[in-house]
């Protein structure tokens, strides 16, 4: 993987990730394909929304179908027939979200398989091996996603262990002869001094890109913005920056304003299945009765298949009848909305008009522009 940085506007960056499998224009949004599928979508449909890279989930694919089934097909690309690049998370977030059924040690994490209850062990080395077998174009280190709230002492211990695990991840990744990219994950909760230690430690180890982890886990939005403003300038400018698990459209806008290049989140797909649709002027909750006889398109400014062909009334009807097509059409639209948003941000950065774009984005939704505390 090669990262090319074209231009900046304030702290926002316009560039691209270059892989053997294709080019990803940045800032980018990665749809989430947890089980080897972006829910309800064929790879061709996902690509048609403008997505150039997707995310796969190491933890879930390890449990089902497992490494051996994956290797029978070649790798995850062959298994799911996605031709572009794939980023896989390390499994850390899923393991730590298991709560009481897992035990963290210095060596790794012991837990019960949530499918059948069998005891399982996952550590940095195993995570690197699974992601190698998946053929991931971007591999994420195995870390502990520090929960929120966490006091300073806990956050420090967690961050320091994640740094030790980062070194073990790097060593196993290299020993496998993996020629793809490996990203480090910055931890430290909402504490700037801990984030400083994490960034320096990861940069000393050396990675192809750097993710900001442990945000969007319940902390106030102001804290997320503050940490991004503090951390992003410390990440080497020639490496991509990835904000994990984020988020709402406004979170993408605010991340880009602070220097983030990559995002992922289940929100557009999960919300689509619940009739929660993102449009230029805000949100449409399509199951509301007021859309029963609305013959207009979902979003007159959207060029997706759904908006070009169907009315709000039809989408309302499908939702009320629990028709699978409704979830699919909603997903097509939400994914396209996110890709159109990212394309708009990229164009605005190219033209040096990002703040004008941001102001228009919020004004059209009747909202104030959040403060930006950067030099």
Swiss-Prot record:
Q: Which organism is it from?
A: Shigella flexneri
Supply one GO CC term from the record: cytosol
In the UniProt entry, which residues are flagged as the active site? 89, 264
Under the heading PANTHER family, the entry gives:
QUEUINE TRNA-RIBOSYLTRANSFERASE (PTHR46499:SF1)
Give residues annotated as binding Zn(2+).
302, 304, 307, 333
Role noted for this protein: Important for virulence.
The answer to keyword Transcription applying to this record is no
Q: Which Pfam families match?
A: TGT
Disulfide pairings: none
Q: What cofactor does this one take?
A: Zn(2+)
Q: Which note does the record give on the cofactor?
A: Binds 1 zinc ion per subunit.
What is this protein's record name? Queuine tRNA-ribosyltransferase
EC number(s): the record gives 2.4.2.29
